[in-house]
Amino acid sequence: MSFKHYSQISKEDIPSMNIKNVNAFLRDFSISDDKEKPITSGLFRLKAGESLKYTYTYHEMKLIVDGSFTIEDETGQKVEAKPGDLFYFPKGTAVTFTTSDFGLGFFCGQRGEGEA
């Protein structure tokens, strides 16, 4: 079995998440063929404006690759996220993403395509 390669995904267009008043964008790039335990990876971008409030219905890892985010969960844990920071969001985590400029994250989640 051969591997798959996706060249320069950070230069690709990332469509809007279509959340009113929130400048959030997300694109799934690679999806596993495992129907029982799917894995999906891609890019998430947030631009300055309203915060994005999101509750994870799946487990996800997110690596900050550019810009910055303020990430706060329902327990009050708050981090000023910068490139190189890695996050694990367990299923059920309620989190708020905010940025004063923009942030870009690479994610890998235990979900199927388009299930974010």
Question: PLM ranges: what are they?
Answer:
Residues 27-30, 40-56, 90-91:
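Conserved short histidine dyad/triad with adjacent acidic residue
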Residues 75-91:
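Short acidic-glycine-tyrosine-enriched beta hairpin
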Residues 1-38:
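A short, N-terminal "cap"/entry segment at the start of jelly-roll beta-barrel domains
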Residues 91-115:
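Ligand-binding loop in jelly-roll beta-barrel domains
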Residues 35-37, 46-51, 68, 113:
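Short, charged/polar surface micro-motifs in flexible loops or helix N-caps
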Residues 46, 56-71:
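Short, conserved beta-strand element in jelly-roll/cupin
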Residues 41-43, 61, 86:
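Conserved hydrophobic/aromatic beta-strand scaffold that supports enzyme active sites
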Residues 42-43, 52-56, 73, 79-80, ...:
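Short histidine-centered beta-strand/loop micro-motifs
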